[in-house]
């Protein structure tokens, strides 16, 4: 998909979670139906909800969950997902509750009535919640990766090379006018190394 975006000049906005659900219709053609169903079942087993298309059975169009809960509330998975989002082609967009590693809000769902399924990922954060969240490593680390991306000119019209030496290994190097960025990710262990170089100064993040 990253190669297709690059080669076809496809312009995208990249999101993990958003104010609505995590869309499923866009997965058709990218993943087999069996894999899509397995993803649905996994998210539901972790407390998420699934919405059918206009009430039709077995024709699902979104799952409702925070991205953090969909990943099993695993900090390493969340941070790798954020790194991949930031290094993929397109403009990254970050939903506030994902940044703060928010959990499924089933109480809000119960209060929301018929359309309450969307409230699972719309928890209101107080100033105290935000202050406490900014002390969490998962929040600070996401912010650090975002700052690395924002400060590096390689992502603005730069050249991307997609390297995949093995099914679970992905390398995404960017380069533009001396600015460089590189992500090396192991999808099986969730380990990754992100490096950006701008004006002779290098920033490195590893997990």
Over which residues does each language-model region extend?
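Active-site and adjacent substrate-binding regions of carbohydrate-active enzymes
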Residues: 1-207
